[in-house]
Each structure stands twice: as structure tokens, then as C-alpha cells.
Swiss-Prot record:
Gene that encodes the chain: rpmH
Keyword Acetylation carried by entry: no
Transmembrane annotation, as ranges: none
Annotated protein name in UniProt: Large ribosomal subunit protein bL34
Native organism taxonomy: Bacteria, Pseudomonadati, Pseudomonadota, Gammaproteobacteria, Vibrionales
Domain of life: Bacteria
PROSITE patterns, sorted: RIBOSOMAL_L34
Length: 44
């Protein structure tokens, strides 16, 4: 059985990247929440 996590940088960026987050209203909410919390990394 193959492992479920087969990392691909492009896929990661497209779904969890900064620009992907900024593209939607809820994504912007995520970024703002992480800014308010003081996260060093806002997105992948």
C-alpha cells in the first residue's frame, strides 16, 4: 500500500499558498486571523 502523502510543491502552493488564500474572502479571513495571532508563517 502506498503512503497517502505524496508531496508536490505546485499542488501545495495552489491550494494552501498565499495567493490562493487571498483569492477568496474566507482565505483573507484566514490570513488576517494568523496576522492577529502573530504567526511567523502566514501560509505555505
Amino acid at each position: 500500500m502506498k503512503r497517502t502523502f505524496q508531496p508536490t510543491v505546485l499542488k501545495r502552493k495552489r491550494t494552501h499558498g498565499f495567493r490562493a488564500r487571498m483569492a477568496t474572502k474566507n482565505g483573507r479571513k484566514v490570513i488576517n486571523a494568523r496576522r492577529a495571532k502573530g504567526r511567523a508563517r502566514l501560509s505555505k
